[in-house]
């Protein structure tokens, strides 16, 4: 697998992918070249998770197992993930994305800020939270299934058993994009009775449903889905009082699926950072509703993307 440097690319100081030769942004040539570049981006993001965010790459296996690391999938964790009082779990969607990414297309065509999970990770670390970054699409290597990670759901369940369930966290937060919502719901079927799981923020994920395991919880589980359709004041996004087992819906600040995690970040963290109870739920949700990053053009088309901040590297 080639590196970005070998392919003649680099991320500039604003996180924009440029060519080494003429310092111009990426331009599509062939699908084969694009896929090769995408794999190089995977490696670059992995490196940034370690060098910029201070995360540690961790082989994924069940406790007590002695499998060789090179035969396993892997995740990224913060140094304090076992001991932190608050633990943030990040789960990407389906397809080619890997740990640390929301959307490969945004990383290549826009910048690191909008396409990676780095802004979420850095904000969590600033708060003193522990961080676990799943890698649910890394299921095989050289056409061989990776043990404990043969499917996205098995990967997520193994991460939960190995890293999250035994942690000392008092509150566990999950942010999941797209298919990551299904993976989250699948995990909750087995672990949803854990009252430490307190808030789940989904970004444009239609696949989440409350499992029966959550019915006997002593502590409320707040779930919000930031959707990439409609607009801020659409009737469907009217804030209502808290109801147990309900998935609240808010506008993500965009009508483009892959932009939802980036545009909703301030609203997501307002929910995660605020002490939420059934009594103040509606107030917190109203505040979060107004924090989505909106495009200058409120009538976005598929080709119109919101403006994003830049991330320095």
UniProtKB/Swiss-Prot annotation:
InterPro entries: AB_hydrolase_fold (IPR029058), Arb2 (IPR048263), Arb2_dom (IPR053858). One of its GO terms (biological process) is regulatory ncRNA-mediated heterochromatin formation. Residues 296-307 have a biased composition (Basic and acidic residues). It comes from the Eukaryota. Disulfide bonds: none annotated. Residues 293-313 are annotated as: Disordered. GO terms for cellular component: nucleus. Belongs to the FAM172 family. PANTHER family: FAM172 FAMILY PROTEIN HOMOLOG CG10038. This is FAM172 family protein homolog Y75B8A.31. It comes from Caenorhabditis elegans.
